[in-house]
Amino acid sequence: MSVSVRDARVSALDRRWIESVYREYLDDLAPLNTGIFPVLGEVGHREPDQLTRWYADSSARILTICKSAAPVGFAMVLPGRPTPGRSAPDFRMAEFFVARPYRRLGIGQSAVALILDRFAGLWEVQEYLRNPGAVKFWRHVIADYTRGDYEERVANGEVRQTFRSGPSRTRKG
């Protein structure tokens, strides 16, 4: 399996592909009912508007996840934000999505490792406790990538992992 990650900003085809699966991504998030994500079709909330904001943010690293060079997912990496009592991490995973037909094949885990190696530094990943699939995925992927060398905090309905990344990390496998 050949997994790669590329900059989505350089390809109009990648942007169109992300636009084509964005509704599926929001459908995955809808059951969380956090109030953060717009209800599809609501007046004033349109998928293209959300994506336009992503692409307008010069600090956002929008990535296309590929299997054998074909798009199968996307990720968005943003600069970290400080939290009370802690300095800001270098990076945070703001969005991460693998299309349904490509899940549970190891593509997501491989893509995460490529992204973490590409953006070396202090990371934070956050999931909602109401999303047990995401919590399980990120705990597994981060534990494997860091070989258990990460911190996790659970508060206010969120799980946050912080850890260091970089290509010098030795992972199992």
Tell what function each PLM region has.
Residues 148-150:
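Glycine-rich ATP-binding loops of the HATPase_c
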Residues 4-31:
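A short beta-loop-alpha structural element at the N-terminal edge
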Residues 36-62:
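Active-site rim helix/loop that mediates acceptor-substrate recognition in acyltransferases
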Residues 124-139, 143, 153-156, 163-164:
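Conserved beta-strand-loop-alpha-helix junction that forms the acyl-donor binding cleft
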